[in-house]
From Swiss-Prot:
It comes from Saccharophagus degradans (strain 2-40 / ATCC 43961 / DSM 17024). This is Urease subunit gamma. Belongs to the urease gamma subunit family. Signal peptide: none annotated. One of its GO terms (biological process) is urea catabolic process. Pathway: Nitrogen metabolism; urea degradation; CO(2) and NH(3) from urea (urease route): step 1/1. The lineage of its organism: Bacteria, Pseudomonadati, Pseudomonadota, Gammaproteobacteria, Cellvibrionales.
Amino acid sequence: MELNPREKDKLLLFTAALLAERRKARGVKLNYPEAIALISAEVMEGARDGKTVAELMEAGRQVLRVEDVMDGIADMIHEVQVEATFPDGTKLVTVHNPIV
């Protein structure tokens, strides 16, 4: 299987998000990369499902709570930017204050 660098990045992100999802389900608090991956994957999958940028900006804020991440992680993540593929092209989605 031949993948270009962008496809490899998406696959790596998705794999990290799956790991984060499993850890969260077990009650393990997520670290910085896991939190970013889980929020990013939610945005990317939502774009693929046809949601709008505005819907995804809000959906990205619903993924994690402060209780889901290690101490200090919520304070470190002020925004998450994801380049997502929509039916009408690629757009940059910014989720502000994603962990509430």
